Amino acid sequence: MAVRRIATFDDWVDLFRVWQKDIGVAYPEIVDYKFEAKFGPTRSNEIEFGAFKGRPKWEKVIQIPDQRIRDAMQNLIVYQGDTEFASVEQQRRLFQNAPSEHDRQSLCRVVTEEMRHGWQMCHLLINHFGYSGRVEAQKMLERRAFDQKRLLGAFNQDVDHWLDFFTYTDFVDRDGKFQLTMLSYSGFAPVAQSMIPMLREESFHLGTGQDGIKRIVRAGVVPLTIIQKFINKWVPVSYDLFGVDRSSSAHWFYVWGLKGRYDEPQAKEEADLERMNEHSRFLFHLECEKLIEQINKHIPAGQTPLYVPDLKFHRYIGEFAGQPYSVKGELLSPREYEEHLREALPQPEDIKLVTEIQATEPNWIAAKGSVQ
């Protein structure tokens, strides 16, 4: 990668093309995609919550009344953009072994739209945040998930195969839907307007994941116990992505009108500023339970249904970080917990088995359109 600092968005686009080639995703259908910034109408032209509620949304950074608020807004954009590019890097090796041409095209669309979302965030940084925005936009293309350099740990983990991919897009991308929704209420108009097209595109990613898991369950070749292990891998990671408990950052994001609650339009009560992240995480957990209920409809009678891991299981962030809770929420001894993790999470032999099944069993996943 070039080390010279970019001066314009066109400079950044040149680096973006180098990044595509460098990570190995410069396929024709991706390179030929028309990358562009997209904006949509927001629910309101006024700030909808926090200390500035009722005032016009800020159209330019200079209108934001405090440098701390400007810095916080930039930071939110940086973290969102970093996840978008990271997810492409995580999924870059899946093109060679897609189960069908339909799935390859779905993967192409998912990674292309993730790239566009990163492009959108960098467009905001470069066009609204001056020198610091340009620096951060360039750094997004210099970090690598496979070098463990992305800002959030979830986006430095490998996505090894298509079961990994489907569980990732169903749950980790669903956290993304929550984050984009909360930012769609932002008092900084360019961010709020950016989220509308991004959410439309993100819905395809979620559907790809949910449909993929259903198709794997319907085929009945991959053992349900292994499918459960990959749910256990990615759901707790998604819990952590909501951030620490009693977060002062989430508190001030709300007070400053930068990031609302997921259910902001429907919420009747005042926001609990001390538990903003916990509120979103709980709503995410409820949504995951409904998803698993839908998947379980495709499991034959008499077989053990899938389930959502408890909010306390395998956490690295928040009140339960590092504590020995089981997938069912039971407190274990440290020794019991170590053994439980070996049983509950994917092990090398599980990854090997899934890889072998996907390479040798042509019917390991049901055809597209075979499930509802």
Enumerate the language-model features and the residues they cover.
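Terminal targeting/low-complexity segments that flank the catalytic cores of oxidoreductases
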Residues: 1-105, 127-160, 242-372
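Secondary-structure edge/capping motif, primarily at the C-terminal ends of alpha-helices
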Residues: 94-98, 183-184, 213-216
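Alpha-helical scaffold segments in carbohydrate-active enzymes
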Residues: 106-127, 197-215, 233-240
